Amino acid sequence: MFYGSVVALITPFKDGTLDRQGLKRLIEFHIENGTDAIVVAGTTGESPTLTYEEHELLIELAVGYSNKRIPIIAGTGANSTHEAITLTKFAEKVGADASLQVVPYYNKPTQEGIYQHFKAIAEETNIPLILYNIPSRTGVDMLPETFARLYGDFPNVIGIKEATGNVARVSETISLTNEDVLILSGDDALTLPMMAVGAKGVISVANNIIPKEISQMCKLALEGKFEEAKKIHNQYWDLFKVLFIETNPIPIKTAAYLMGLIESLELRLPLYTMSKSNEEKLKEVLRKHSLIK
């Protein structure tokens, strides 16, 4: 259900509030362009600056707008176990198809603390849980052994978004679990290398603006057609890189605005607009790929 190309959706704002119609348009855009699933309220969706009410509203609106035409994965992780459980229960209640659970950030739990955190969430909910390992943001790395333990102990822990930048993690995780475990790349630049050794797809930033291409690359990789998939990977390599020229989601939201996919380039502080020099670099790559004029 969650194989292939999953978009880490940007959150459109307008006049300081959630742009409901903008969100609806983005969801339709991804349905029309072959995206396999949508993550809302993740890192790319600016979840840290959403109010609790906005977080719930975003999930509920996405579920309603999708109307079961595309799976919705709700970002409901937190560094408070109680808060993560509460938000995950809400996502389950309103009909989200899965939950993305980030490793607790800032408070830097031990591996046993990470296990106990996700154990509590898994025991309190029934929704499929995709764990999210991104040590560059959280300050702690969930080791493959910890994930494997959770995967083996709780049937609703179905997979992991692996954003360590380490392709070997795929093989390590498979060796501790099985070939069918859901591993999703958390880095567009590493999607194809990770799929070559057993990952099942990507939770993608670039998919916000090139959904057809990312979807096709993942489809080819899942079919074992790596030579064809490699052509797409290499063609968009410069785009994958420039989208991280500043902190995500600043460049991708700027690109979406320049392409007319969102009406307002609103970022919430402490995120701030791109520097002029970096924006020009972004525009240059977008023009090269005929995404803007």
Curated annotation (Swiss-Prot):
Record field: catalytic activity: L-aspartate 4-semialdehyde + pyruvate = (2S,4S)-4-hydroxy-2,3,4,5-tetrahydrodipicolinate + H2O + H(+)
InterPro entries: Aldolase_TIM (IPR013785), DapA (IPR005263), DapA-like (IPR002220), Schiff_base-form_aldolases_AS (IPR020625), Schiff_base-form_aldolases_CS (IPR020624)
Cellular compartments annotated: Cytoplasm
Keywords, in A-Z order: Amino-acid biosynthesis, Cytoplasm, Diaminopimelate biosynthesis, Lyase, Lysine biosynthesis, Schiff base
Site note Part of a proton relay during catalysis, residues: T43, Y106
Lineage top rank: taxon: Bacteria
Major localization listed first in the record, in broad terms: cytoplasm
Pathway: Amino-acid biosynthesis; L-lysine biosynthesis via DAP pathway; (S)-tetrahydrodipicolinate from L-aspartate: step 3/4
GO BP term, example: lysine biosynthetic process via diaminopimelate
Residues at the catalytic site: Y132, K161
PROSITE patterns xrefs: DHDPS_1, DHDPS_2
Cysteines engaged in disulfide bonds, as pairs: none
EC code: 4.3.3.7
GO terms, molecular function: 4-hydroxy-tetrahydrodipicolinate synthase activity
Assigned GO CC terms: cytosol
Binding residues annotated for pyruvate, in chain numbering: T44, I203
Coiled-coil zones: none
Pfam families: DHDPS
Enzyme class: lyase
Subunit note: Homotetramer; dimer of dimers.
Protein function: Catalyzes the condensation of (S)-aspartate-beta-semialdehyde [(S)-ASA] and pyruvate to 4-hydroxy-tetrahydrodipicolinate (HTPA).
Family label: Belongs to the DapA family.
Protein name: 4-hydroxy-tetrahydrodipicolinate synthase
Origin species: Sulfurihydrogenibium sp. (strain YO3AOP1)
Gene: dapA
